[in-house]
């Protein structure tokens, strides 16, 4: 019987990959399949909490937990390794720790920051990308305040922070900054009036997924807490001094001691090397989340460009979508093992909430707009639910937001 076991290989332990595996281990027996999960790190991190760790309002260690803590070791083989090559036809995946065969492959390799070729952005701006970059950024911000307080010749630029991007991540990071800055000013005896936070956005509107009313709430709340917005202002370069922006056709230098890029992500760069038709690390999938020509390969999460039937544009890359895709793929793998046909993925939009620090927010929940403390509470519910969905009640108590 063991010789008939299928090899199920899952690449990536982010929201999509880990949701797939934790669902599979509940529904598939060891006689049916051998499940292997490969991830670069020994830990999973809550990517939707990185803005908190980056600002320093949440310890970076609270954002992560060991992958193996949510796995059934008798059901899943966990390998800490970096994937270097995917050979679709040979059904092999190469890593820095060896080669792994598969009958069914799930690609959930996650995201990396996308700077869209802006000169100097990768070299001179912090990225909100993973727990390592989050820790570096939060420490850098605090170091700037400490150095300013200790310096005899003070440079106000040390207290200036530039944030590129007024989308979801950028705005949530701004909210956390407005919570963190008063703490740092109190700790180091810094006049808060000297702190300058500027958000630069190329698009004509921030938070494009929300109504004008919700956007106005977010802008008013953040402006009241010291944030200045420069909307419809493209960043053309980044240097050691800050951002270079374009205003009315002319370039202007914005100076700051800290520059942060929060305006774009893309799927894993391994995608272009492994598949055709990949754009920004994402490949268009079929309705069951497999790819053309390979019914045994699923692509989900940030690497997937899933276009719902009848639609023209792919769904955005969100944790909510990634986790629903993981559940769908787990069910379809079970169906494949049973000799049944796969089912189409159907996304259920339960809503989206953008936090503005720990006490405010804006969002749409089941089609209804919410703002203020209600939105902040709902955000904590969403964050805790995500942990519960993967690790159960125990992990929710340990890592949840309540």
Curated annotation (Swiss-Prot):
Chloroplast found in the keyword field: no
Please provide, alphabetically and separated by semicolons, the GO molecular function terms listed in this UniProt record: NAD(P)H dehydrogenase (quinone) activity; NADH:ubiquinone reductase (non-electrogenic) activity
- State the active site: 172
Single biological process term from Gene Ontology: aerobic electron transport chain
Q: How is the cofactor bound?
A: Binds 1 FAD per subunit.
Q: What Pfam families does this protein map onto?
A: Pyr_redox_2 (PF07992)
EC assignment: 1.6.5.9
Q: What is this protein's name?
A: Type II NADH:quinone oxidoreductase
- The record lists the organism as Staphylococcus aureus (strain bovine RF122 / ET3-1)
